[in-house]
Amino acid sequence: MNEKYLPIKIFEKRKEYDDRKTEAGGSPDRDYSWVLHGEPLKQHMQLLTQSLSTMKERCAERKSEGKVLPVVMKTTLHAEALAKTHRKKLVDVLESDGHENVIGVYGDRQILSLVENNAILDKITDVINKEDNASVISAITDMELYEPFIERTESGCGEYRVRLLNYNDYDRNQLVKILFEQHCRQHNIKLNTATRFTSDMYIYRVTIDSADEMNFLEDFEGLYAAEETKPLALTLDALEFDEASMVRVPDPEENYPLAGVLDTGIAGISYLKPWKEAKEHTNYPVEYQNNAHGTFVAGIMEYGDELNSYKVYSTKGIRLFNAVVYPDERKEAIYPEDLVDNIREAVKRNPQVKVWNLSLGIKEECELDEFSEFGMALDNIQDENNVLIVKSAGNCANFMKGLPKSRISKSGDSVRALVVGSVAGEKELYDYAEPNTPSPFTRIGPGPANIIKPDLVFYGGNAGVDDLGNLVKHGVRSFGL
C-alpha cells in the first residue's frame, strides 16, 4: 500500500545535530525558529480551534449514523518539529484524558489517535487556547478526521485487499472484524479470504462488482485502506541448470540436519529423492504443481558445492522437508494472503522443522519508513512457532538499465528472518561484478528504520550486458526439470 498513507511504528532519534535552534536566549519556546509568536500564533490557534470544532461536528454525525467505533483523528506535525521531544509533547496532549489514544503514525508527519468523545477534544482545545503552549501549537499543522486510503482499479470493480484499523485493543479489534464481515454480507460484498498476518492484523480480500458496492466498502467505519490486489508472479533470476557427476545417498549412520523448503515442491529426481523426508506438506494437489523452482532451490541446498565448484559447505548432506506452498501459476493464481496462509500452516503443522528456506517473495522493494505486511507476517510466524526462516533478499534487473540496485524486496524486511544476498564467485567476459563483491542483480539494504539487511551473503552468480545490449548471466547451477 502506498507509503504516503501507511502508518509506521518507528520513532527514530534524529542523527544529525538539530540546527533549528536560534542563537538567542529566552524561553524554551523561543529556542526553535519554527515556533510561532504574536499575531501568527493567534491566527494558528484560531485555525486549530476551528479544526477541532469541525472534528466535533464529524463525531456527532458519526454518532447520529449509528457508528459504534471511535473516531480516528489524524494530526499532522510541522515539517521541522519531528524530533522525538516534540512528538512526545504532542502525544501527551492527545492522551491528556488519561487514555492511550495514540494508535499509530502515518509516514513521518502524521499521528493517528482515538476520539472516544468530546472530552478529549475539549482538553486539546484548552491546550491550543493558551499562548504559553506556543511550541506544541506550532508543532501542529492540522487536525482532521482520518480518511482511509482507497486505491481504485481503473473500472472501480475487481478484487481488493482490505486492511482494517488497528485500535491497539484486542476486544475492539475483534469487534471491527465482526462488524466488517457483517457489513460485507449486508451489502452483498463478496468476502473471499481473511488472512491473519500478525496477532493484531488481518488482511481481507473482497470482490467489488459495482460502484454501489465500492461506496459501501469506503463507508465502513473501521476501514484503514483498500487497494487492488494482484496475483504473485514467480521468476527464476540468474539461474542455470546442470547435473551433478553422481548421486549421493545418506549414510544411515550419520545424523543430518533437517531443513524445510517452502516453495513450489521438490521433484522426486534421483539426486534429491534419497534426501527427501517421507512425510511432506502440500497445499496443492500434484496436478496443480510445477516443481521446477523448488527442485532448483533444493538442489543448491544439497549439491551446491559440487555443482558450483565451491568448498564452503560444512555438512555432508541435509534432510529436506518438502512443503508445497506455491502452485503452478499457469493453473491457479496465488495472492500474497494465500502464500502467508500456506506458510503459516506448513510451519505450524510441522514443529519438528526448526529451519525453513523461503526463496519466494514479492517483487516490490521495501520502504524506508515502514515494514511490509508480508515481512510482519513472517516475523509473527517465526515468533509463534519458534523457528528461523532463511529468506532471499531478492533480485532485480536494474543493472541492465544502468540504474541503482533496488532495496531488498518486501518480505525481505522481516526482522526475524535470516535474509541472504548474493555475491559473485567469479568474473567472466561481460560480467559486471568482481569476485566476492555483490552480484549485479542482488538487492541491497538498508531495511526500514535502517535495520541491516541482508544479514548474510552467499555466492549467487554474476551477470552483465554484452556489446549488443543483451543480458549475459552466469548464475548458480542446480537441477532443472
Residue spans of the language-model regions?
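Short helix-loop-beta-strand segments that form the rim/entrance of peptidase-like active sites
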Residues: M301, N308-K331, K354-W356
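Acidic-leg catalytic submotif of subtilisin-like serine proteases
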Residues: A244-P285, T295, I300, P454-L456, ...
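Autoinhibitory propeptides
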Residues: M1-E61, E80-P250
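Extracellular S/T/G-rich loop segment that most often corresponds to the catalytic His/Ser-adjacent loop
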Residues: N255-P257, D263-A267, Y271, S409-L481
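Substrate-binding/access-modulating region of protease and related hydrolase catalytic domains
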Residues: L175, Y326-R416
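Catalytic cores of nucleotide-enabled group-transfer and carboxylate-activating enzymes in metabolic
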Residues: E213-A226, F296-G299, Y303-L307, Y313, ...
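Flexible, small-residue-rich helix->loop connector segments that border functional cores
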Residues: L262-I269, A298-G317, R344-R349
